[in-house]
Amino acid sequence: MHSFVSRFGIRRALGFGAVAVLAVASHAVAAAPAKPAEVQQIELFQRLPAEGAASLQALIERFNAQSKEYQVVLSEQDWKSANAPHLMILEGDDEERFLAGKPRFKPLYAVMKETGSALQTLRPPAMMTRTPVDSKGQLLALPIGLSTPVLFLNRDALRRAGMNPETTSVATWFDLQTVLGRLADAGHTCPYTVAEPGRVMVENLSAWHNEPVAAMRGKVSAPSFNGMFQVKHVAMMASWHRARYLQVFERGNEAGQHFASGECAVIAAPSNSWAGFRSKGTIDVGVAQLPYYDDFPGAPQNTLADGPAMWVAAGKKAAEYKGVAKFVSFWLQPENQVVWQRETGYLPLNRAGLLASRSELLGTDLENIKVAVGQLTNKPVTGDSAAQPVVGREKVRRIIDEELSGVWADRKAAKEALDNAVVRAAGS
């Protein structure tokens, strides 16, 4: 996107005599004014939640204010257009479609290397989604929106039910059950809800207890999330649903909206939800680690990090990739990492961001990140607690949620629902 603009002066061909006359007369030949450098635009496509979109816009404005050669502009064109944007923030189904078929991206590590730019990120850990990482652990894309499920609590609701938010334990699922019972007794109609049930109840609870969600069938990895542990947890959640401790909302971010409004007192949701919950200002929000079963050997283990990543389009000019690298480097500067974490709730991308999350100077602004990082690094990752390279992950999550809806409607037992989900996922 940067085009090299040569600066040139106009030189006149002068004979010896003319030079002598000019020398005597001391007439200087003036250079023509330099042509102003062209500004190269870097187009970026994104569909982040409100807090993320606003923070990204502010980041772009800061970059543009200090960059003379490159300007980042938001684009409505996505990767399906004939001239795809240089940068695309993708997740879920859109990311999976983008990655299907012929390669449409240039690996981020290659962009940074070819432009002589350092990629100042943490090495991708084993509990992070494998989508933006190659087999050598190199970043194919920048995972700008990582999160992991944690527990959020309406501290005001706990106080009204006679509990002290500072001392009330929700460390285990049985602790949480006691808390939800007291909330229900106090008249709360939605003590607990969960965003993305399949992601929380199956993927992350399995990793949190070092239980596999896939098994090798010959040389192929096949879904295997219908074991005794997963069945036990879903069965317990079904009993909570019947007791009206748990409400499940199946449309988009509806669960988060019910928590933010104060209707639901506790929610298991992605750690980045912290930014949105606090921005509403309607409730006093607390955050805690996801509960675990203390009667399960070795628990808790670690949870998983997932979320949108920023991909670089293939087929662009070398000068344009230089602009991309400059923007990525700017994003990874310590001060920008701190602002990004505070405003979006997403996990740190490098050591500077990680250190900021531990700083006492920021008060509770990054409390969600402290909790999330504590979960992710609780114990060294094992083969069973590592993120699995699942093909069609979003489709599998939808299958799990669809089967679980039969449990909430009291049409299916926990084992039947999970058995069905495994069969459907294997054939998807």
Predicted regions and their residues:
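Extracytoplasmic/periplasmic substrate-recognition and gating elements
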Residues: 65, 161, 246, 279-347, ...
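Conserved N-terminal structural module of periplasmic/extracytoplasmic solute-binding proteins
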Residues: 2-4, 15-17, 23, 28-102, ...
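Short amphipathic alpha-helical coupling segments at ligand-binding clamshell hinges
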Residues: 55-59, 232-236, 318-331, 417
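C-terminal capping/gating helix-and-loop segments adjacent to ligand/active sites or protein-protein/ligand interfaces
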Residues: 134, 367-425
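Glycine-centered hinge/linker elements that transmit conformational signals in sensory
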Residues: 177-183, 219-250
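Short, solvent-exposed loop/beta-turn-alpha elements that line the ligand-binding surface or hinge
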Residues: 109-123, 168-169, 191-192, 211-232, ...
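Hinge/lid segment of periplasmic solute-binding proteins
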Residues: 95-150, 204, 286-288
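Extracytoplasmic/periplasmic solute-binding protein
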Residues: 135-144, 174-222
